[in-house]
């Protein structure tokens, strides 16, 4: 079963996976421009012709489709989690959750921005996560 923290971190996890896939796609695209033409010469044996450029284009196309699906899943999951966070009634706890799990800010940075000590912010964060736990019914 998923913990509350795992549930909330899904947005950032999806985002990181998408960024990595985009890097992979960029590398493949770069590689595809460096695929050289196969020299045509005498052939001793006939075999099935390979099309390295076509193979590369197909891989890039498949990867772009995968990225598109991941982005769609990311947007759905993000919307779901944001709606869950919006159910937290205390505005301070809402702000902490939004900054931490939607904007990916550290608790230290949030504490600094909001004018609280790190220890107080950690306590408030635990309280905020407990609210989400109640809303979602996790870890009963």
Model regions: which residues?
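Short alpha-helical "recognition helix" segments of helix-turn-helix
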Residues: 109-114
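N-terminal positioning helix adjacent to the helix-turn-helix/winged-helix DNA-binding module
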Residues: 77-80, 91-93, 124
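DNA major-groove recognition helices of helix-turn-helix
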Residues: 121-132
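Short amphipathic alpha helix immediately N-terminal
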Residues: 89-103
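Secondary-structure boundary motif
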Residues: 87-90, 134
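N-terminal interaction/assembly modules
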Residues: 1-84, 130, 136-140
């Amino acid at each position: 079963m998923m913990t509350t923290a795992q549930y909330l971190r899904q947005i950032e996890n999806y985002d990181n996976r998408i960024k990595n896939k985009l890097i992979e796609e960029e590398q493949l695209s770069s590689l595809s421009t460096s695929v050289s033409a196969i020299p045509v010469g005498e052939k001793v044996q006939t075999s099935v012709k390979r099309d390295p450029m076509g193979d590369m284009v197909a891989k890039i196309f498949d990867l772009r489709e995968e990225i598109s699906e991941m982005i769609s899943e990311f947007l759905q999951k993000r919307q779901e989690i944001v709606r869950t966070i919006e159910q937290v009634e205390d505005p301070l706890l809402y702000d902490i959750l939004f900054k931490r799990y939607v904007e990916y800010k550290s608790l230290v940075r949030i504490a600094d921005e909001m004018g609280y000590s790190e220890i107080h912010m950690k306590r408030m964060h635990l309280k905020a996560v407990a609210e989400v736990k109640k809303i979602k019914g996790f870890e009963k």
